[in-house]
Amino acid sequence: MKFQYLLAIFMIVLVVTDHCQAFIGMIPGLIGGLISAIKGRRRRQLEARYEPQQRNFRKREIDFEKLFANMPDY
């Protein structure tokens, strides 16, 4: 075989193995996500993550209102 063909085959094999490794690496995460979705844990985790951010946002909003209330009008 010519060197060009060997290089092309090597590149194709390299790309295919890279994609296979990425897919194999995703499998445990997909299985864990599927199990947690079946058990209903994922929804609770997302709600727990969202609520503190919402509280912090409200606190920041109140702080800004106080700051702007004390500023003079021009």
UniProtKB/Swiss-Prot annotation:
One of its GO terms (cellular component) is membrane. Keywords: Amidation, Antibiotic, Antimicrobial, Membrane, Secreted, Signal, Target cell membrane, Target membrane. It is found in: Secreted; Target cell membrane. Residues 40-74 form a propeptide. Residues 1-22 form the signal peptide. Expressed by the venom gland. It comes from the Eukaryota. GO terms for biological process: defense response to Gram-positive bacterium; killing of cells of another organism. The modification Lysine amide is found at residue 39. The keyword Cell division does not apply. The keyword Signal applies. Antimicrobial peptide that probably forms pores in target membranes. Has antibacterial activity against Gram-positive bacteria S.aureus NBRC 13276 (MIC=5-10 uM) and B.subtilis NBRC 3009 (MIC=2.5-5 uM) but not against Gram-negative bacterium E.coli NBRC 3972. Belongs to the non-disulfide-bridged peptide (NDBP) superfamily. Short antimicrobial peptide (group 4) family. Amphipathic and cationic peptide with an alpha-helical structure. Fragments comprising residues 4-17 and 5-17 have been detected in venom but it is unclear whether they have a physiological role or are simply due to degradation. This is Peptide Im-4. The lineage of its organism: Eukaryota, Metazoa, Ecdysozoa, Arthropoda, Chelicerata.
